[in-house]
Amino acid sequence: MIPDLSVNFAGIKLKNPVLTASGTFGYGYELADLIPLKRLGGVVTKTVTLEPRAGNLQPRIAEVASGILNSIGLQNIGVRAFIEEPLEKLNKIGVPVIVSVAGVAVGEYVEIVKILSSQNGVSAIELNLSCPNLKKKIVCHDLPLMRDVIRGVKKVSRVPVIAKLSPLVTDISELALTAQNAGADGVTLTNTYPAMAVDIRTFKPKLSTVKGGMSGACIKPMSVRCVYDAYQDIKIPIIGCGGIMMGEDAVEFILAGATAVSVGSSSLVSPGNLIAIIDGIEDILKEKNIKSVKKIIGGINKVRNA
């Protein structure tokens, strides 16, 4: 028996639940010579902004125990250049394309999505709500602002809108519920965790910005908990993200309530891990004689309530 790995995420049909995570896979098409991109459930692009950004100064990435610390600074070519080349190349892959976008104000988010909505080949928008606004405050930490961003984008978007949320909150369920009530069609849980590291040889921070975002295996239990908590309270689907290194990790997120998963650090270390994760999910379903991955979404709740 070959299990059915297909899922429906907010109306988007995915052949399997494994997506790339924004920020570690370029725009998506660059690795076509390394792995069969057609096998992926979908591609989430690196974050696109209204105007090009050079990003932060080097060093902006550092390896730490069981993870990666980064502060890239949203380096990208800007939305207009993105639709000229990367989007066109992505559309040739044949998988859903989810475009990650970020801005410093409501109007900027709306303008980016307006431009993207005029193009074919965009399956969904992922709002990076963990970046600073004009007041240097994380967007999703300002609930009224987050509501305004989501509502504004929903008015102009022709495709589903997914809110990617920061884990640095007291109650992730409240944050996810706020996103849902503002009109989000799904949420991604979670973005990186704030962290820093110091080089004891130079007595300097390992990143030029001092602090950055932690990703990798070390954050998985915390991100799984975020997915589980949010799943109890929201009705919109969840993309689980954070520390997925193998098929077993992906299944953990799905059992906790994720409909799909996005893989970041693991694909940065070895792009082929994406394919191994897809195969790993299939192997676990075969072993358990489960016909469809859809049957295990939120499965831990069914076991607890049995």
UniProtKB/Swiss-Prot annotation:
Q: How does it assemble?
A: Heterotetramer of 2 PyrK and 2 PyrD type B subunits.
Q: Which NCBIfam families match?
A: PRK07259.1, pyrD_sub1_fam
Bound how, and how many: what does the cofactor note say? Answer: Binds 1 FMN per subunit.
Q: What protein name applies here?
A: Dihydroorotate dehydrogenase B (NAD(+)), catalytic subunit
Which cellular component terms (GO) are annotated to the entry? cytoplasm
Which coarse location class applies to the principal site listed for this UniProt protein?
cytoplasm
What this protein catalyses is: (S)-dihydroorotate + NAD(+) = orotate + NADH + H(+)
Pathway info: Pyrimidine metabolism; UMP biosynthesis via de novo pathway; orotate from (S)-dihydroorotate (NAD(+) route): step 1/1
> Which catalytic residues are annotated?
C131 (nucleophile)
State its location(s): Cytoplasm
Give the protein family: Belongs to the dihydroorotate dehydrogenase family. Type 1 subfamily.
**E.C. code:** 1.3.1.14
According to its UniProt entry, what is the function of this protein? Catalyzes the conversion of dihydroorotate to orotate with NAD(+) as electron acceptor.
Indicate which residues the UniProt annotation says bind FMN: S22, K46, T47, N128, K164, G216, G242, G243, G264, S265
CDD domains assigned: DHOD_1B_like
User: Residues that bind substrate, according to the entry?
Assistant: K46, N70, S71, I72, G73, L74, N128, N191, T192
User: What GO biological process terms does the UniProt entry carry, in alphabetical order?
Assistant: 'de novo' pyrimidine nucleobase biosynthetic process; 'de novo' UMP biosynthetic process
Quote any Pfam family the record assigns: DHO_dh
Cofactors demanded by this protein:
FMN
Q: What GO molecular functions are on record for this protein?
A: dihydroorotate dehydrogenase (NAD+) activity
